[in-house]
Amino acid sequence: MKFGVLVFPGSNCDHDAYWTVQQVARQPVTFLWHEAHDLENCDAIIVPGGFAYGDYLRTGAIAKFSPVMASVKKFADAGGLVLGICNGFQILCEAGLLPGALMRNVGLKYICKPVQVRVETTDTPFTNACRQGEVLTIPIGHMEGNYFCDPSTLAELQRDSRIVFRYSAPDGRITPGANPNGSLDNIAGICSPGRNVLGMMPHPERAAEPELGGTDGFKVFQSLVGTMVAR
């Protein structure tokens, strides 16, 4: 099993993801530079958070043209596991691997704080170590986390159980007050039709060790490793 962590100019959570995979999950991992075409036989790809290309034009709008993203798309189309975190989620949407877009937060301010998200489905390679309806506490840190899509896409996401995480109150209720950024239907994370690509705004790598204040985020990595072992 081997993980690959993409590195774009402006990425700043790549080392956090690398550390979590190598030091916490105890799995082999390598960095993959944005100009690379070869994914080096990785079994799972992480598109990390940060500010790829300075977030110029739009978040992820330039990163989607990086050579490595063409390889990631082929990898995903073949069933490869891809996890996009924060800016990585934005990049996956821009690249067409996930539907919709991430817009400016409704308050037009950068938000950095722990939030609660409810696990809406465990039928993904990223959440099979969780319980249905489980509430996880995971930090966010973004300016453009306001997920939006057209009504037909939202209906499709709901119908196919592709909304993986939703912002919730600590008791699991989905309320407007639990929504930190105005995201449509309190969406915090969605998956692809094949369920092998996940984009999420919260940072699971920032909640993977007790020293960081919690380990709820590690369940995403635990799920991935378990899936890869079973394959």
Question: Can you annotate each of these PLM segments?
Answer:
Residues 50-51, 88, 143, 204:
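Active-site metal-binding loops of divalent metal-dependent hydrolases
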Residues 88-89, 123:
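Short, flexible active-site-adjacent loop segments at beta-strand->alpha-helix junctions, enriched
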Residues 52-53, 89-91, 146-147, 171:
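Glycine-rich nucleotide phosphate-binding loop and flanking beta-alpha elements
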Residues 73-77, 105-231:
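Amide-donor transfer/coupling interface in amidating biosynthetic enzymes
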Residues 1-85, 93-99, 103-111, 118, ...:
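N-terminal beta1-alpha1 cap of cysteine-dependent amidohydrolase-like domains
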